[in-house]
């Protein structure tokens, strides 16, 4: 397995990460409910193949993915780089409506108080006293960037998080966070061979700021591994 530094930090991460959307259960996150044993099995496979970068989010099953990971990580927390997210929550404490699912109303809130509470909730659910990386799940233009950056930097100083990043953003957002005094280590965006255009816009900026460009959706939610795609004969000009 190859490794790289996470942005300007001293954190070594594998170039392949485990995304844990599917551990969330419920109506959308996976086909069935996952267990702690499922999570342990995933971590075992990751460790066997040298993958140390684990990505989750509070809204994956409204807390379920984080809780399962927390239990599965007991006794081996230091073997993995743990990344979760902030901004999307179901506390009904303000922010912008994002979606309704499984009986919960999820809002997007990047105010300082919300970011701090998101991180504290994640620490509690996962039973750890620090998070290696926290990503703003959906960048929100309704609240000042300076406020969000200030909250994230405070959490770094407090030792609750080691670094932070952005997702579902625009290149201008990365520049704005940096210009507001931030140090964005990772940008996580949708990118695949079928949908490369949005990601390409980040490459020069990521190089400028030494920010890792992390992709999700690289298999187009399974389409690129489906029989319909794998067995298709493409023309030479396709």
What are these regions (language model features)?
Residues 1-81:
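N-terminal binding-site loop/beta-alpha segment at the start of enzyme catalytic domains
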Residues 3, 139-238:
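Beta/alpha (TIM)-barrel catalytic core signal, keyed to glycine-rich beta->alpha loops juxtaposed to Asp/Glu
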Residues 6, 18, 46, 54, ...:
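Conserved, mostly hydrophobic/aromatic
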Residues 32-46, 108-126, 170-176:
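Short, acidic/polar
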Residues 51, 128-131, 161, 184:
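A structural motif
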Residues 79-91:
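A short, structured active-site edge motif that brings together acidic residues
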Residues 91-107:
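Surface-exposed, active-site-proximal loop segments in enzymatic domains
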Residues 123-142:
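Active-site groove signature of glycoside hydrolases
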